Amino acid sequence: IIHVLRCFDNGNIVHVDGSVDPVRDKEIIDTELQLKDLETVETRIKRVEKLANVGGDKQAKIEYGLLLRYKEALEQGKSARVVELENEEEVAASKNMFLLTTKPVLYVCNVDDTSAKEGNQYVDAVRNAIQGEDAELIIISAQTEADIAELETYEEKQMFLEDMGLEESGCNRLIKAIYSLLNLETFITAGEMEVKAWTYRKGWKAPQCAGVIHTDFEKGFIRAEVIKYE
């Protein structure tokens, strides 16, 4: 879940609640997601309770126990992701529940262009609020990104970023943060006709990566020629 928070003052852009408070905005969305998950959990509990307690279904027992822990956390105003999964069976059961608050979260602090590099007091408040959460935070100025998008050449964009004191665009940093949060990386294949990027999960070995290109490449894997590049 990408959670965009307003972290800038601008009298011409009126906030729906009349003031700028990104922590309040975060908590409102958190509550809405938690209430939706609580509704989902209570519905599933009704469905699996009998199977777990009467039918003796092993999978139902695992799911039922996890659902009760999720319910307790959600009723306390916590997200489901704070519940620690005890084994692989619970990990599998959790994935099948599709709860919103078990998903990884990336907080995007949208600041004015003068705060694009270091952030501001609003960003500091968000950082303090998410301590203890398994979440990422990045700072982006949507106005700066809009200005960059209007430039035509790569050189113009790089010069603009340098003038702003930035090493790369917010879009690039957003993509990298998402990849990191989802435990993903990229490898590149190069040939005479094209260069292409492929996504894989961190920790995969070369045969698994080859399978991303084509399943036959994984089955008949021989070797990979690896080239370092900057």
What are the residue ranges of the model-derived segments?
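Alpha-helix boundary/capping and short turn/kink residues
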Residues: 7, 35-38, 57, 116
